[in-house]
Amino acid sequence: MRVAVCTLLVVLLAGVALTPALAQDNMAYAPMAKAKFGNLPVIPKCGTLAVANGDPTKGAAVILIKSTTGCVIPWHWHSAGEQLMFVAGSAKVDMKDGAPVRMHTGDYINLPAKNVHQFTCVAACTFYLATDGAFDIHYVDKDGKEISMDEALKAKAPMKKAPAKGDMKDMKM
């Protein structure tokens, strides 16, 4: 019985360990210099993007995004989780349920699915955004009610937020 249980555990753990490797079985190379940037209708025009890998309309993808200084993507959430890896510039990511995070060149942040946040590019930003599912964006008002991008861009009221917990840039890793 013990042998059967141990064998089952080994098989299950091996399957879990191999799943990410099997998810992408082709090498991908996307030189930034050759990226073709364009606007996306659901993102303010101050942000442009280029797909580095995958198809963001269908599933997991890596997107290269450039934003101008002062660009704000108002309060929103995504159905998929996302990871941001900063290449250049700096930004502030406000969190509905936490302290704002200041991002700088070389920084990384993981945002789980449906995490309500707002992105402000403090100095011209370039970063990679990796999603674990199809890309979408749901803008919300200060009470968390879903609204259009135009309404979100016009809104001036701050989001009702949880108490600040400190700036993550000061954390030791």
Question: Which residues does each PLM region occupy?
Answer:
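Positively charged n-region of N-terminal signal peptides that target proteins for export
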Residues: 1-4
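Short acidic-glycine-tyrosine-enriched beta hairpin
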Residues: 55-57, 91, 96-114
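Conserved short histidine dyad/triad with adjacent acidic residue
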Residues: 58-78, 110-113
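Short beta-strand His + acidic residue motifs that chelate non-heme Fe in jelly-roll/DSBH
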Residues: 73-75, 93-94, 111, 116-122
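A short, N-terminal "cap"/entry segment at the start of jelly-roll beta-barrel domains
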Residues: 21-61, 144-173
